[in-house]
Amino acid sequence: MPNLLLTMWDTIKSSNIGILVAAGLGMFAIIGGLSMLSYHYTLSGIKSRTVGDGQHGTARWATDKEIRKTYAHVPFKVRDWRKGVSLPTEQGLVLGCKGKKDELTALVDSDDIHCLMIAASGAGKTAFFLYPNLEYACASGMSFLALDTKGDLARNYGSIAKKHYGYKHISVIDLRNPTRSDGNNLLTLINRYMDIARKQPDNLAARAKAEKYAKILAKSIVSPEGNSDHGQNAFFYDAAEGLLSSTILLLAEFLPPDEEHPEERRHIVSVFKLVQDLLEPARGARGRSRFQLLMDKLPSEHKARWLAGAALNSSEQAMASVMSTVLSRLNSFLDSELEQILCFDSAIDAEKFAAEKSAIFLILPEEDQTKNFMAGLMIQNLSRELFAVADENGGKLKNRVILFCDELGTMPPFDILPLFSAGRSRRLTMVPIIQSVDQLVKNYGKEGASILMDNCQDVICGGFAPNSEAADAFSKALGSRTVLSGSVSRGKNDPSQSLQMMERPLLTADELKSIPKGCFIVQKTGCHPMRTRLRLFLEWGITFEEEYRVEEQAARRVYYADQNALTRAIVRKYPPKLTEQKATRSVKGEGQLHDAPVQEMVVAEDIDYDRMPHKRTPYNLPRQEVDR
């Protein structure tokens, strides 16, 4: 029995010793490990993860849930769409995608927005952004205008829009090859409504529309950059707008095609010719120009006479300055190649463009900058006409319209800011595409560039050049977040590590410059930014078919209006009349009619005083100016 007790005691004693030994070894390992760790603090162990409570910034990326809530997710099925199956109902811009090749889902912003795209040359603006958006625009039935510097958009998508998506109105305005271009007569809508008003004299609405579109066109030509820089010369520019509107209305009203002249003479080049001819001083009427005599032949209540009132009631020198201002603004249209486009009727006008599925491709020659003004004029004039159409339909267009303004930074400045502020609520979406923000600063000034960017609810950027300063600006715009930072110090016996919070940009300029091709950053008003990818058009399932081409046309003859024909047309419609008393005095030779107003004088249309044997005026009839 004692032996058994001794054995049990030895067992208990040995087990306690083992436990004590194990505990001692464990404590030694822990202390040794901590000691070893204290000697091995590394800076690489400090990660820049988000910490704190936004002390230095709260910028972050949008979550998947937020992306699903903000952007419409539309399966991008090109093959089905081109067969008329499963066409999308959401109209908007494609700003990203998810999924794998040929099974992509597009991220579409269907809100009323403008979108600014910033990408350097070669970043894939056409292949990654424009082609998917043009395909989606066709599938969802939106009308669009696309500026095309290379001509690829027109060649590749003209036939697709017409053949697969039922676009009946497709216009290619080729400033590089005018003989392969559709017409673009700036007076198309004015002529149309004036023809209706002429056939239906009681149709006040038609005449009012003609006058409205004439004033829109005159403002776009005389003040392409707006009225802000006119200063003390504001009178001359305002009077020039009125005089140009008046001339356009006279041309549209009195010189339509007829049996004698079946050709269309009502175009912008004829307007220049008329103003130039009417600027000359009138023969036999000292101190008066031909334009003043022409206006005297109109009834006192004619709107063309009222529109030109500021110029007519100014001094001779001031009126000459006003007409010279008009001529200087019209000089840009004097080009034999441009005449092949400007002097023939347009295939599409603003009303068709807004009501039906339509596409306009404007091809700009990169090698000839002198024709770039046409792009600004077309955008400005078309937008203002669309605003007028929207106002007649409750303030919104029936169908969304998108203007893809590629290479906007290389075009001359024009009054584009009102288009951004007024277009969004009318379902008109502007998509300016630039290479650098500095292009906007150069053309529109620092304030203008800032206003333009502030009016863009979406900004998409990518493909920054290695030395681009735009990356710094965009990095600042993305904001900052609060991240972990720290330091490690090593002493002889007591190494230490300290941690703190610091500010870090959401993406640094270096990170922006190293974004792979096809990857973009999207910012939207009221939302966190999104990192997205736009794949190459082939991966979207987009394929091209036969090229769309406008048939080659030989140089067409251009017909111009002249002031003689205009004068005869006015006199035929509003023949001058003599009062009975003055007519009697004239017949009896009781005196000259020197005091008779010019519009009451008898006009001898068939008399050419320069060819008469003598140039003396009969004593009983004042010599009249013969406008030929």
Predicted regions, residues:
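A short glycine-/small-residue-rich loop at the edge of a beta-strand within enzyme catalytic domains
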Residues: R68, A72, R82, F373, ...
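P-loop NTPase motor domains
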Residues: V94-D102, A106-L428, Y444, D510-R531, ...
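Short intrinsically disordered, low-complexity coil segments enriched in acidic
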Residues: P2-N3, A470-A477, C527-M530
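General helical secondary-structure elements
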Residues: H56, D64, Q500, P529-R531, ...
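Basic- and hydrophobic-enriched, low-structure N-terminal and domain-boundary segments
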Residues: M1-A123, A127-E135, S140, T179, ...
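Conserved ATP-driven motor cores of ASCE-family P-loop NTPases powering translocation/secretion/packaging/pilus
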Residues: F420-A422, R426-I521
